[in-house]
Amino acid sequence: MSAKSAISKEIFAPLDERMLGAVQVKRRTKKKIPFLATGGQGEYLTYICLSVTNKKPTQASITKVKQFEGSTSFVRRSQWMLEQLRQVKGIDPNRDSAEFDLLFENAFDQWVASTASEKCTFFQILHHTCQRYLTDRKPEFINCQSKIMGGNSILHSAADSVTSAVQKASQALNERGERLGRAEEKTEDLKNSAQQFAETAHKLAMKHKC
């Protein structure tokens, strides 16, 4: 089981929440925990997770989850409601960068994702979630690449393409229906003409027979 799957199962599932995405990060300015609950020092892995509640009305939140060295379990550390997110900074819109900042009402963190692609995926999910669940004040996405902000546009583009294809197919069917209708009319006319010709021929045959 991957770390993200384990986090989803261990941290969010028991609270009837669904994890939408997560990104493994470390601080740009390295910071160690000087004292753990066990009384010693140690390294740890940090994940920034985005989740929503299964119960309505849906609430979205961002949670900081840690896994300490030597442990197989995960610990929920900090959590913010999505409404508290004020700014998402991508650092450099002109190149793939793993660095990013998150500004909340009462906190500010500077992170480096494990990879630029992982950050990109998380940003796309985060942007889409903000557009879907936040009706009032939405966070600013600053210095983000167009492909990150385009996640939602891609969905709309795909939807537009499908709609266009359906419209074209419908138009083609209508045109085909009209052609079939005209063909049926011609067939009916030919049928009537043939029937009239047969009746006339029969009458002539009977007349000559008499």
UniProtKB/Swiss-Prot annotation:
Give residue ranges for domain v-SNARE coiled-coil homology: 151-210
Which residues are annotated with the PTM N-acetylserine?
2
- List the SUPFAM superfamilies: SNARE fusion complex
Q: How does it sit in the membrane?
A: Peripheral membrane protein
Species assigned in the record: Bos taurus (Bovine)
What GO CC terms are in its UniProt record? Answer: cytoplasm; membrane
Which Pfam families does the record associate with it?
Sec3-PIP2_bind, Synaptobrevin
**Protein name (database record):** Syntaxin-binding protein 6
The coiled-coil segments of this chain are none
Keyword terms: Acetylation, Coiled coil, Cytoplasm, Membrane
Record GO biological process: regulation of SNARE complex assembly
Principal location: cytoplasm
Q: Keyword DNA repair, does the record have it?
A: no
Give the superkingdom in one word.
Eukaryota
This chain's function reads:
Forms non-fusogenic complexes with SNAP25 and STX1A and may thereby modulate the formation of functional SNARE complexes and exocytosis.
Q: How does it assemble?
A: Part of a ternary complex containing SNAP25 and STX1A that can be dissociated by NAPA and NSF. Interacts with STX4A.
Compartments it resides in: Cytoplasm; Membrane
